[in-house]
Amino acid sequence: MMRFSSMLVRNAKLCANVNQMQVAAFSSKAPEMIKIEKVGEKQNVALIKLNRPKALNALCAQLMTELADALEVLDTDKSVGAIVITGSERAFAAGADIKEMTNNEFATTFSGSFLSNWTAVSDVKKPVIAAVNGFALGGGNELAMMCDIIYAGEKARFGQPEINIGTIPGAGGTQRWARAAGKSFAMEVCLTGNHVTAQEAKEHGIVSKIFPADQVVGEAVKLGEKIADQSPLIVQMAKEAVNKAYELTLQEGLHFERRLFHATFATKDRKEGMTAFAEKRKPQWESK
């Protein structure tokens, strides 16, 4: 009951200021390391900006907790149809906070909750778009790859340099690179720590589109607006179906897709979409 009441308070505070959501309180105080606002013509896209400029948005525990809390609230906000995560022009996120991790030991790292809230991005049911400028390295690269779609600036740089400091990626880098770009390229990235240009990342299926640096966020928001204009329920089903391609065999995936396709025929939005198409009008979605 306490958790439910807390969520209500957080939702109310998050939505209090539509144009500039300086989120009031995810815990006991306003977030310090992220900025949030609702953007777009219909204010239906949430823009989260990582805000540790002096540290090139290094992903410390506090930042990741604030991000996880924000995503939890936004995922239940019916006025938000898509979420964009971005950093600065110099860095989306230059990696995890190495100083914070230096003195960690195996026992506490393995048995504790270290990195546990990093799954928040991939757990979100709504589409999440990464708008990447500058460096997206280590944990920053992994954060971008947790998102559903990546738009990148022309000078963006991706990579997993953990090998250079005596460790390996720990938030999905080895797995997501291999699934997206294949074993050979993933091995090169993870075993050398080499940076990957935006164009190389696009060629290997990591990045969807590339834009001039000053257009990346705007284009990501436009994409978010287009997605937010669709049925939220059907968007969620489509996202789930695509993600299953990484977990299931082809036959299992085809079966899963078919079942979800059949399930759309139990929704009001499928009926409305097809009726609106036949009547040559814009559908009015209910997310039911």
Curated annotation (Swiss-Prot):
InterPro entries: ClpP/crotonase-like_dom_sf (IPR029045), Enoyl-CoA_hyd/isom_CS (IPR018376), Enoyl-CoA_hydra/iso (IPR001753), Enoyl-CoA_hydra_C (IPR014748). It is found in: Mitochondrion matrix. It catalyses: a (3S)-3-hydroxyacyl-CoA = a (2E)-enoyl-CoA + H2O; a 4-saturated-(3S)-3-hydroxyacyl-CoA = a (3E)-enoyl-CoA + H2O. The record marks 162 as: Important for catalytic activity. Pfam families: ECH_1 (PF00378). Keywords: Fatty acid metabolism, Lipid metabolism, Lyase, Mitochondrion. Its main location: mitochondrion. One of its GO terms (cellular component) is mitochondrial matrix. Pathway: Lipid metabolism; fatty acid beta-oxidation. Substrate binds at residues 96-99, 139. GO terms for biological process: fatty acid beta-oxidation. GO terms for molecular function: enoyl-CoA hydratase activity. Its EC number is 4.2.1.17. It comes from the Eukaryota. Homohexamer. Belongs to the enoyl-CoA hydratase/isomerase family. This is Probable enoyl-CoA hydratase, mitochondrial. The gene is ech-6.
